UniProtKB/Swiss-Prot annotation:
Name of the protein: Pregnancy-associated glycoprotein 71G
Enzyme Commission code(s) on record: 3.4.23.-
Record family assignment: Belongs to the peptidase A1 family.
Gene Ontology cellular component annotations, sorted alphabetically: extracellular region
Tissue-specificity statement: Chorionic epithelium (trophectoderm) and placental cotyledons.
Lineage: Eukaryota, Metazoa, Chordata, Craniata, Vertebrata
Record: glycosylation sites: 4
Organism expressing this protein natively: Bison bonasus (European bison)
């Protein structure tokens, strides 16, 4: 987490991974 600016898509994927 923290690189959502450089990897916005990864931030969204993280939400699915956590959920």
């Amino acid at each position: 987490r923290g690189s959502n600016l450089t990897h916005p898509l990864r931030n969204i994927r993280d939400l699915f991974y956590v959920g």
